[in-house]
C-alpha cells in the first residue's frame, strides 16, 4: 500500500530510513541505489541517514561513486561539535571525526545536512555546545544545519544525572542563545539553518548563514 501511495502521490523523493545506511560498503549501497532507480525511474532524489563515525571512514572517491549511483543527500545527527558534550552524551564520535565525515561527503559531491541539539550539554556546557558546533560547521560548510532541541528521556544516563542534580537543564533562553551563537559565529559559510521541528521553541525559522 505504501509503495502504491508513493507511486500515485509521491514527489519522486526516496529516503533510506531507519538507521545508518552508509554502514554498508559503498559497492553494496551503490547496487541498492542503482536498483532503486531502475525499478522506479520516476525517482528524482534519494536521501539517507549516516552516522559520522561511519562516514569518516568513507573516502571522497567512494562518496562520488554513491553520488553517481543516485545518492543526493546525507543527513547526520551530530547533536554537538564539542568533544566534552559528545562524551557526556556517549555519542561515540569526536569533533575531528565529524569534520572528516563532512568534508568527505562534500568532496564526493553529495549534499550534507547535520543536526544540532541546543541544550544537550546542559547549563554547564551551553556555551561550549554552541562554540563546538560552530567550529565544526565552519570547517565543513554543510548545506544544512537542522535544529533538534534536546529532550532528556527517562531511563537514560543523562536523565539519571538530571534526577541526581548532576545535570541542570538549559532554559529556553539558553537554547535560543545557542542558536544565536551559531549564527553569529558563522564565518562566510553558505549553510542554511533550518528550525522546523515540533520540539523546537522556534519552529519556523530558516535562512542562509551567509546572506540572511
Residue map of PLM features:
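Conserved SAM/AdoMet-binding glycine-rich loop
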Residues: 2-107
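Short linear capping/connector segments at secondary-structure termini
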Residues: 14-19, 117-120, 161-163, 198
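Short, small-residue-enriched loops and turns at beta-alpha junctions
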Residues: 21-24, 52-56, 120-125, 153, ...
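Residue-level "edge-of-site" marker
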Residues: 49, 79, 118, 150, ...
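Short, well-ordered secondary-structure micro-motifs
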Residues: 58-59, 87, 124-127, 157-160, ...
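Conserved C-terminal portion of the radical SAM core fold
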Residues: 73, 96-158, 172-196
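Short glycine-enriched, charge-decorated loop/helix-capping segments at active-site entrances
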Residues: 87-92, 162-168
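Radical SAM enzyme core and accessory elements
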Residues: 200-212
Amino acid at each position: 500500500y505504501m509503495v502504491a501511495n508513493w507511486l500515485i502521490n509521491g514527489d519522486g523523493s526516496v529516503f533510506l530510513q531507519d538507521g545508518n545506511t552508509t554502514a554498508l560498503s559503498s559497492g553494496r549501497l551503490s547496487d541498492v541505489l542503482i536498483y532503486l532507480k531502475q525499478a522506479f525511474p520516476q525517482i528524482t532524489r534519494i536521501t539517507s541517514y549516516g552516522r559520522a563515525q561511519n562516514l569518516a571512514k568513507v573516502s571522497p572517491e567512494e562518496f562520488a561513486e554513491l553520488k553517481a549511483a543516485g545518492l543526493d543527500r546525507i543527513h547526520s545527527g551530530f547533536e554537538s561539535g564539542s568533544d566534552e558534550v559528545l562524551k557526556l552524551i556517549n555519542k561515540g564520535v569526536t569533533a575531528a571525526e565529524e569534520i572528516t565525515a563532512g568534508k568527505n561527503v562534500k568532496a564526493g559531491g553529495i549534499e550534507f545536512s547535520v543536526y544540532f541539539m541546543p541544550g544537550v550539554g546542559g547549563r554547564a556546557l551551553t556555551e561550549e555546545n554552541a562554540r563546538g558546533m560552530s567550529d565544526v560547521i565552519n570547517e565543513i560548510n554543510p548545506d544544512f544545519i537542522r535544529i533538534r532541541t534536546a529532550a532528556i528521556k527517562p531511563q537514560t544516563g543523562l536523565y539519571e544525572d538530571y534526577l541526581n542534580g548532576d545535570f541542570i537543564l538549559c532554559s529556553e533562553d539558553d537554547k535560543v542563545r545557542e542558536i544565536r551563537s551559531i549564527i553569529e559565529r558563522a564565518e562566510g559559510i553558505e549553510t542554511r539553518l533550518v528550525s522546523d521541528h515540533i520540539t523546537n521553541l522556534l519552529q519556523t525559522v530558516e535562512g542562509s548563514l551567509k546572506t540572511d
